[in-house]
Amino acid sequence: MGSDRALLVGAAILLAGMMTAPVSGHHGTAASYDGSKQVTITGKVTEFWWHNPHSALFVDVTNEKGERVSWSIEMSSPGVLLRAGWTRRTFVAADAVSVVVNPSRAGTPVGVCLNPCAVTVNGKALSVREP
């Protein structure tokens, strides 16, 4: 199951990179994510990647059919998150989270929560808002 997840995450990242590279520069999230929509993802953390250029949060969600769906959420860089008071230990596996994201235009379980970013982890509200 772990290798299937790694393959899926790798394929999603590769596909997102291939779709956005010709259309926009580094911060061209509009090509991949729908900025006019917001979706609240509520579930359990499976992983949190604390690395440049963007951190990533992985959340397992139970959909309306009772099926598990694994979401990948792109977040700000560790430097931006540090200034907001976050650390590499802000999220750990099995934490209950709620994250407001702009969803993927492709309809896949991928979203972006950059600036501003609102998250609730184990009942505690966190945010990132840079000028």
Per-region residue spans from a language model:
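Bacterial N-terminal signal peptides
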Residues: V9-A21
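Conserved hydrophobic positions within beta-strands
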Residues: G43-V45
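Short, structured beta-strand/loop micro-motifs enriched in basic residues and often containing a Trp
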Residues: M75-R83
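OB-fold/S1-family single-stranded nucleic acid-binding modules
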Residues: S104-E130
